[in-house]
């Protein structure tokens, strides 16, 4: 049996209008769609009559192994992420699983990364033009990165005067990281530094608030 293919698909911000044509094509030709339950819902209209595998938020590696297993069985698989799959998405973990399994580019399962608009781009478009010059992204999730490392990155970015996009600012169990990030930033930035708080960009529950670093 011939090997299949894995598409690592970035869906963009979430609305079908902002999904790339290549992302649609990848999903259309796929036998199997794998993703976090919330992301599966975003493409519900595009995946009828396909095998759909839904996984929870902390089951990233399970998704990767499922994709590899089916591709080795000859299936075409779309492993989906919101935004861009290479920016806090599934591309990195998938390549780790592939390499650990002995996979090499051009040998066996074919892999294609399908880029999408990441949150830094989508959110910026909704609030004006904050990324005209140098910018950086920092995730506040310490699930895979130690918090002291994240703190050092925040401080370095603040000292360097980057425009900063903070991903994963808080969750139900993780509420203090954003407070600590604010404390660090205030050591190097003015209290009146503008802040845009964007949630669910381009989705039905989109919410945008403007504040300052001191009051965010």
Describe these PLM feature segments.
Residues 1-3, 25-26, 70, 103-106, ...:
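Solvent-exposed alpha-helices and their adjacent loops that cap or buttress functional pockets
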Residues 1-111:
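Class I S-adenosyl-L-methionine
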Residues 6-8, 159-216:
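A contiguous loop/helix-start segment that scaffolds small-molecule binding in enzyme catalytic cores
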Residues 9-10, 79-82, 114, 138-141, ...:
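Short beta-strand segments
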Residues 15, 21, 87-160:
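Class I SAM-dependent methyltransferase SAM-binding "motif I" and its flanking Rossmann-like core
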Residues 22-26, 49-50, 94-97, 128, ...:
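Short, solvent-exposed amphipathic alpha-helical segments in soluble enzyme
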Residues 41, 86-88, 120, 202-205:
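Short, active-site-adjacent cap segments at secondary-structure transitions
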Residues 67-73, 125-129, 150-154, 208-215:
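Short, surface-exposed amphipathic charged segments that create phosphate/polyanion-binding patches used
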